[in-house]
Amino acid sequence: MLRRALLCLAVAAAPGLYADAPEEEDHVLVLRKSNFAEALAAHKYLLVEFYAPWCGHCKALAPEYAKAAGKLKAEGSEIRLAKVDATEESDLAQQYGVRGYPTIKFFRNGDTASPKEYTAGREADDIVNWLKKRTGPAATTLPDGAAAESLVESSEVAVIGFFKDVESDSAKQFLQAAEAIDDIPFGITSNSDVFSKYQLDKDGVVLFKKFDEGRNNFEGEVTKENLLDFIKYNQLPLVIEFTEQTAPKIFGGEIKTHILLFLPKSVSDYDGKLSNFKTAAESFKGKILFIFIDSDHTDNQRILEFFGLKKEECPAVRLITLEEEMTKYKPESDELTAERITEFCHRFLEGKIKPHLMSQELPEDWDKQPVKVLVGKNFEEVAFDENKNVFVEFYAPWCGHCKQLAPIWDKLGETYKDHENIVIAKMDSTANEVEAIKVHSFPTLKFFPASVDRTVIDYNGERTLDGFKKFLESGGQDGAGDDDDLEDLEEAEEPDMEEDDDQKAVKDEL
């Protein structure tokens, strides 16, 4: 600690001694290996983004990150924001376990042994609120109306506990809830003027927000669990737009059933269609999260593909559950009235809607090449043929590993094209789905031996022609592995830092 204090004094008193003082870009410190340690010593609290110049997520984060840095600097905060180009500073990236972009870590008191991973949203308010929670009290004491008003205005969502006795059991429960939430500012007050300002004549908790009804008053027994449920239920808008910034809130939230309206902002009656969607949302608050996506936006095209949609098919509605297995649902009607959307959601909650499985049309020449082409419509017939041993690659067109495997898979097809009972096949899993098979990574290789038992064997051996041949000649034994082994192998091999933006977007967002 003494060494750190002396170094801070030296930096402050004699900038010339700081041989490689970091530059600033929009209030964000630009760090390199040569000045990283000194920056940690000079700043008690330092949030560092490890980024890549080509990363789409990093580009989207940049203005919000700079906005947060400027806000904290203007407040005279001890917290500073910094960034490291991990493609240039590979030693730093390796030291701090950077495997994907952006990776954001929080350093306190120069501690490099265990920096905290940043886990909140990607809007400026989220960043500022998370940092203040990490460096200050769980709830700010509000001595007067001006302080309360300042807190409410500081963020899209804020929570204030009104307690005449701030040492009461209810107040303690409130503070425990405040400690559990990183991305929302909390305040606590016992001041009678603040009670009057917000029309309270007894103890209570109020969530203030700059959308929808503006505020929600907590009702019920004040416990940590009840307060957390209340906040999670009310903190998001009835309808939220999907963007790079809102994605962490959407996918990291407690509500795992999402209904999506793919709505181009250029469409006629845009406001009317969005209004219908919002009207339907009122009946499902806390049960289904209503999200709308600008289907014309370039960044959202991969999501359309994931749902098997084309731009010209929008506006459209789809529903997805984000439990252990993602399952999609499609309304029977294309009408986007509030009544139709409400009916669809009710039927889903009642278990009356079957999952929607995508399938491309079957190509006329699907079986004319050594590697047979499977789609959703012919998968069952081919893969589970009782008289055939079928080896299938489940791939994604954008997957780098799949592209590397393609020529080997084609050679495998050539090897067995005239075999009486071995079939080599492939299926684009971004455009085709089958109920019996869940694909978690690309490429996934599965073997369907000739059998009446619908047996499925995962391949986890070498991705070489010889490895595949040994596997097939052994009847699916040499190289077999369970699905968990396959996922671990993919994760171990996956060069996260070299993924193209689209691939990472699908993984992160879906």
Curated annotation (Swiss-Prot):
Q: Where is this region: Disordered?
A: 473-510
Question: Where N6-acetyllysine occurs along the chain?
Answer: 202
Q: Classify the main location.
A: endoplasmic reticulum
Matching entries from SUPFAM superfamilies are given as: Thioredoxin-like
Instruction: Give disulfide pairs as residue numbers.
Output: 55-58, 399-402
Q: Where is this site: Lowers pKa of C-terminal Cys of second active site?
A: 463
Any one Gene Ontology molecular-function term assigned to this protein's record: protein disulfide isomerase activity
User: Can you say what this protein is called?
Assistant: Protein disulfide-isomerase
Q: How does it sit in the membrane?
A: Peripheral membrane protein
Tell me the lineage of the source organism: Eukaryota, Metazoa, Chordata, Craniata, Vertebrata
Motif Prevents secretion from ER in this chain: 507-510
**Which catalytic residues are annotated?**
55, 58, 399, 402
Q: Which Pfam families is this protein grouped with? A: Thioredoxin, Thioredoxin_6
Carries keyword Manganese? no
